[in-house]
């Protein structure tokens, strides 16, 4: 499979971001609103990245660069809450890995 490490990283990031957003929503805290928004955006961008890469789209590289930006922003926001919430810590770690894989692809 083409860029299988990047696709696996995007899939893991999609799942971690969805889980983090869901857990943050359950906390009902205004402090987490940006985290929720970035996690949801990052998950969608990761999903798009996977789809475009699998069909060898001419836009795949552009979306991978957007994925790097989105994962980096999401990781930075999740890290603000990482000391108190495992789902935020895990999401930040997975986002950093995904950004690295997309950058390398």
Q: For each predicted feature, which ranges?
A:
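Amphipathic alpha-helical hairpins
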Residues: 1-105
């Amino acid at each position: 499979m083409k860029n299988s490490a990047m696709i696996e990283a995007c899939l893991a990031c999609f799942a971690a971001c969805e889980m983090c957003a869901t857990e943050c929503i359950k906390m009902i805290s205004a402090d987490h609103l940006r985290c929720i928004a970035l996690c949801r955006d990052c998950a969608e961008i990761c999903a798009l990245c996977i789809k475009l890469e699998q069909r060898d789209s001419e836009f795949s590289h552009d979306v991978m660069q957007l994925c790097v930006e989105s994962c980096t922003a999401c990781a930075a926001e999740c890290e603000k809450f990482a000391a108190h919430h495992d789902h935020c810590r895990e999401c930040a770690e997975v986002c950093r890995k995904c950004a690295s894989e997309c950058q390398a692809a």
